[in-house]
Each structure stands twice: as C-alpha cells, then as structure tokens.
C-alpha cells in the first residue's frame, strides 16, 4: 500500500493536485481562512511587543490626574520615582580572594 494520499499523486511533470471539487465554497473558505491565519500569525510575531504592551498598559501612560491638585500630582510623581530608584544599601559586595 502506498503512503501517498488520494489527493496528491506523482506524475511525470511533478506533483499534481487531483481535487475534483476545488471550486467547492467550503474549500475556498478554508483556503482564505488559512491564508488569513498565516498572515495574522506573521504580523503577531513581528509586532508582539507593541501589541501586548498596548493591551497590558492600555492607551494611557498611567492613572488619570484630571481634577487632582498639582501638589498631589507632584507628590505622586515623587512616590513613583522613589519606588523606581535603586537603593544601593540593599546590595552586598562580595570579594573573592
């Protein structure tokens, strides 16, 4: 028994598709969906950092400060910056002899 399928058979001119119902709407729809899926997958792999960062953080850079006094905004900025700053006192230098 041959390992070849009924659809693909070798001929003298190379591989040839012998699909009798290639104009079937289901086959056409499946082909279109397959091509679209491939295109979307390629775009996802190319731009995944941009896409997922936008989904994670949204369009805004942070919480809305609308209606908040300027003094509270500055206090919030300082808190955020101090949370980001690295405190060198937490690190221990180990010297090997």
UniProtKB/Swiss-Prot annotation:
Lipidated sites in chain (S-palmitoyl cysteine): 50
Region annotation (Disordered) ranges: 60-83
Feature type site, description Essential for channel activity, possibly by being protonated during channel activation, and by forming the channel gate and the selective filter: 37
Topological type in the membrane: Single-pass type III membrane protein
Activity modulation: The M2 protein from most influenza A strains is inhibited by amantadine and rimantadine, resulting in viral uncoating incapacity. Emergence of amantadine-resistant variants is usually rapid.
Topology, Virion surface side: 1-22
Pfam families in alphabetical order: Flu_M2
Function: Forms a proton-selective ion channel that is necessary for the efficient release of the viral genome during virus entry. After attaching to the cell surface, the virion enters the cell by endocytosis. Acidification of the endosome triggers M2 ion channel activity.
Family that this chain belongs to: Belongs to the influenza viruses matrix protein M2 family.
Recorded domain comment: Cytoplasmic tail plays an important role in virion assembly and morphogenesis.
Protein's name in the database: Matrix protein 2
